[in-house]
Regions:
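Extracellular/periplasmic carbohydrate-active domains that bind, remodel
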Residues: 1-514
Length: 514
């Protein structure tokens, strides 16, 4: 059975309904109106170069009856070349592209034909579609001075109300404008098999990153936007995070490929921050930092706005070579609730699930309702990491308050980890440990369930630190480590190649082992 995830005026993203992780069980061919248009083996696939407001009949030998869909209608479609864009990779096309965006009528499409469009940051508006066709590249300018600085906070000159415009790692601070930027906009689609290239190596954005005067630009930044869809494109080489929706609602990323060199700093693929309803489906990532990092700000933003990252779905994604496949935090002071990760493959990431929090994130820093199921991990150093002692950011990261193993008072600075379920998973060639879950003595992790999981260890495993905290020793082929957990349920879990005890526990309120 096939389900439509997203249909624009010229593209469609569809998903096979099964319980397999990322890949289907066999190759398949897709026909549109009787003509072969796609072949592949992934659970999610896309069709492009469709006509607006047109009915299509999709057929495949693996479905019993044809699937019929209609593309959306649109008011008009305009080429950026009509506004003077050259697309030779040398000419600065910023003015031409921005003018085209400004002039585009509502419910219309701006088309980028094959070519390389060198540009400074672009500002989008509501009710438009950008189509970046195969062979088209939006290339960020290598001139840093072309990226305007956006203030972190502005105040209404009449009411004094605070408005956040710029943000960096969970704080409202001045930042360079993203290459593709939208503010308080709605109903925006970016589709196509083209590329958006941040051009960070040429601009020198990855050099001396700790001493930049302003937050480095994202590839795409959506601030307080609604109904945003990004479908099909290849995003690469951003100066920092690649896709960053901030305080936005109903955001979806479908069938993207996002890449950056393994050693590139802060090049997370998708980092939704304090967003409500986010879908990340059918995407492939290979980056220098976390593949997906779900955030909700540091304590100032979390305490003031109390806006959790809520109702996020991650499904049928392939994540490679990141620090964490799916990371929560460390900027999560507003909380993370109702997260489902399903049918994904994690390959050679440092960690599978990676929770990063610490004392000081605040009482609103609640992570709860997290489910991982039907996951396959290959060569992941530590598949499950829940760390309430994270020490790799903030000026006080090395303070005794952060690292002390003493039971401190629960106060307005204390985070909370609630219920977590991991089931139907295969984790092959682990190295450091199967699990490393370490709660606070004053605020243990509420409940962890691990069921129907196979962990195997690489015979060539190298010692590694499973989590980033003060005084963290290296592990190698360790089993499941749990400390400070109120209720732990272990059901039908198999470990192969572990050195020592399979289950290492301390300060567990209730242990249920089946």
């Amino acid at each position: 059975m096939i389900k439509a995830l997203f249909i624009s005026s010229t593209s469609a993203c569809l998903e096979w309904q099964n319980d397999l992780s990322y890949y289907k069980d066999s190759e398949y061919e897709i026909y549109l109106n009787g003509e072969l248009c796609f072949s592949g083996n992934t659970n999610v696939f896309s069709l492009f170069n469709l006509l607006p407001d047109t009915e299509y009949t999709l057929s495949c030998t693996q479905i019993d009856s044809p699937f019929v869909f209609r593309t959306k209608s649109e008011r008009c479609a305009i080429s950026v070349r009509d506004f003077g864009a050259v697309g030779d990779g040398v000419t600065d096309d910023t003015v031409a592209i921005q003018t085209a965006i400004n002039c585009l009528p509502k419910h219309s499409r701006l088309f980028f034909p094959k070519g390389t469009y060198l540009t400074a940051p672009l500002c989008l508006k509501s009710h438009i579609t950008l189509e970046i066709s195969e062979g088209a590249v939006i290339l960020g300018s290598p001139d840093k001075s072309r990226y305007p600085v956006i203030p972190g906070v502005c105040r209404d000159i009449t009411s004094g109300e605070e408005h956040i415009f710029g943000v960096w790692e969970g704080n409202a601070v001045d930042m360079h404008q993203a290459l593709i930027f939208a503010e308080h906009a709605e109903d925006i689609s970016i589709v196509g098999r083209g590329m958006v290239n941040g051009n960070a190596p040429e601009a020198g954005w990855w050099i001396d990153v700790k001493n930049q005067p302003y937050g480095r630009p994202r590839l795409m930044f959506f601030n307080r936007c609604e109904n945003i869809r990004v479908h099909g494109i290849h995003g690469c080489d951003s100066a920092s995070w690649q896709m960053h929706p901030f305080f936005s609602k109903n955001v979806a990323f479908y069938d993207l490929f996002i890449s950056a060199p393994k050693d590139s700093p802060n090049t997370d693929a998708i980092d939704p921050e304090a967003c409500d309803v986010v879908d990340i489906i059918g995407c492939r990532f290979s980056v220098g930092d976390d593949c997906i990092a779900i955030k909700s700000g540091k304590i100032d933003i979390g305490k003031k706005y109390k806006t959790p990252a809520n109702k996020h779905t991650i499904r049928n994604c392939l994540m490679e070579f990141g620090h964490g496949a799916v990371t929560l935090g460390s900027e999560m002071a507003g909380g993370v609730t109702n997260l489902t990760v399903n049918k994904c493959v994690f390959r050679q990431t440092d960690r599978g699930l990676r929770i990063k929090t610490r004392r000081g994130r605040g009482k609103d820093a609640i992570i709860d309702g997290v489910v991982f199921e039907n996951i396959r991990m290959e060569g992941v150093i530590t598949p499950i990491v829940m760390n309430m002692w994270y020490n790799c950011c903030d000026p006080d990261r090395d303070s005794e308050y952060v690292w002390s193993r003493k039971e401190l008072p629960v106060d307005d600075r204390t985070p909370y980890l609630g219920k977590f379920t991991f089931r139907n998973m295969v984790c092959l060639a682990c190295e450091a440990a199967a699990c490393y879950c370490d709660g606070l003595p004053e605020q243990p992790i509420e409940a962890i369930t691990v069921e129907n999981i196979l962990f195997t260890f690489s015979p060539d495993a190298k010692p590694a630190r499973p989590a980033m905290r003060e005084f963290m020793e290296e592990f190698c082929r360790k089993g499941m480590y749990f400390d400070n957990v109120r209720t732990l349920t272990v059901d039908n879990v198999t470990l192969e190649g572990v050195d020592g005890e399979e289950l290492l526990t301390s300060h567990i309120g209730k242990l249920i082992r089946k």
